[in-house]
Amino acid sequence: IGYLFTAKSGTGKSTHTNLWREFFKERAVMVNDDKPLLRVTENGVTAYGTPWNGKHRLSTNIGVPLNAICVLERSDENHIEKVTAESVYNMLVQQVYRPQNPQKLLKTLQLIDVMADNVNFYRLGCNMDISAAETAYNGMKGSI
């Protein structure tokens, strides 16, 4: 089961995923630390590792079913809530590749809509304590 974390640049995505690796040890596998490839079908979403794996060079050549997308926000206390796709739509559009060609951009937006029907969405307020990883996991695992 895969979880994808997204946020504005500098929010702490790499820091948070590092907490997952610290908390879960070898059970936490990084598919891609920067730009995973998402295959979106009517049957679900699969996340794949790619060579574009960011400054930390963390990527695994695998594909995993994507269960949830979690929007990270900084907070003094750790908390997570399930949210609607509509509430995070703007963030999703900002984070995907947006073609200049209008027809291709429309297709991208349609894929986001299909993805929204097949993936759970969460908003995580977190600090840099290892308990943030546990909070995120416990909040999202119930939606499997």
Where are these regions (language model features)?
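Walker A/P-loop nucleotide-binding motif
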Residues: 9
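Post-Walker A alpha-helix
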Residues: 16-17
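Glycine-rich, often acidic-flanked micro-motifs
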Residues: 2-6, 22-144
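Conserved lysine of the Walker
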Residues: 13
